[in-house]
Amino acid sequence: MTPFLTTTGGGSVRGFGRRRPVPSIPIPIAMTIDYLLVAGGGGGGDGNGGSRAGGGGGGGFREFAAQSVSTQTPYTVTVGSGGASYVNGNNSVFATSSAAGGGHGAYYGGGAADGGSGGGGDLYGNAAGVGNTPSTSPSQGYDGGIGGVGGGGGGMGGGGGAGAVGGNSSYGSRGAALGGSGGAGAVSSITGTTYAGGGGGATWTDNNSNNNTAGGGAGGGGTGGVYQLANGTNGSANTGGGGGGGTTSGGSGIVIIKIPDTRTATFSGGVTSSGGSPSGGYKIYSVTATSTTNETVTFS
């Protein structure tokens, strides 16, 4: 190959062949985002065929504003699944932040669990679960309600919600003992939607005549069951609602990400998401499921 000679000022540069362009390397750019984490709701206490169980606690609710991130950097994103009967919900995660799964409700064979919001207690002396566990500021959830109020045939406590403590059971006669309502969830400033309501506690009766049910908290909490008549209902999917007292599952959580409309979010293959259309200067993405705990989102 014949070398070429290029003159530059008073000197020259000798080389071989043709110069190749230097590839462009994207430079990370700082940006700010808002995001919401709602963990999976706790399952209702195991009714063992009879719904003598406290409601599950709503998943932890944590909202973050004006958080600094960089483009070209992958960030972990995980949506927590709801807990099965007598099982806590699973955590939701973005980057290094997490919301804790809701605690399961109590039943005659075991106590309620602590969690994002605590599970409801029962009439057998099993205490309600403690919310905001682990502790965050602001609080990610509240305690479950107390069961067996007044003694005798009192009902079961409602699960705590992200916005309020679970309701205590009410006591009349054995045929009129109601479970406590699930604690209300919290409203997201990003979406305006209420999430992470607690599940209603089960009603206890020994004469099969009381079919009154305790409602779940606003934000997807399931309805409590009635002993010997009906199991409770599950927490609603993608709300983090706790399951109603009696052989129920909590609802799955959700991750919401709000970014400037000049930017785009790209998710890894195991992420189920929707949204992303520009509106009012922003794009809002809803992440409703992740297939592994190693899924990511990258901004550009």
Predicted regions and their residues:
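Low-complexity, glycine/proline-biased repetitive segments and flexible coils/loops
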Residues: 2-23, 32-300
